[in-house]
Amino acid sequence: MAKAAMIKIKLLSTADTGYFYVTKKNARTKTEKLSFKKYDPVVRKHVEFKETKIK
């Protein structure tokens, strides 16, 4: 069987609230770490979310 291209990642809030999103990325084409500005409902603002491993 072939190795799956899509892997699950966790996008963790940089506001240190502990809030996170879970998404998928193609590990073969996107080798760099992802970073998005998304909504954090704990601080009720848009903040940067950075990629971390799912434990």
From Swiss-Prot:
Coiled-coil annotated residue ranges, if any: none
GO molecular function: structural constituent of ribosome
GO cellular component terms, A-Z: cytosolic large ribosomal subunit
Top-level lineage group: Bacteria
Keywords noted in UniProt: Ribonucleoprotein, Ribosomal protein
InterPro entries referenced in this protein's UniProt entry, alphabetically: Ribosomal_bL33, Ribosomal_bL33_CS, Ribosomal_bL33_sf, Ribosomal_zn-bd
One of the protein's GO biological processes: translation
Protein family membership: Belongs to the bacterial ribosomal protein bL33 family.
Protein name: Large ribosomal subunit protein bL33
Naturally occurring in which organism (per UniProt): Beijerinckia indica subsp. indica (strain ATCC 9039 / DSM 1715 / NCIMB 8712)
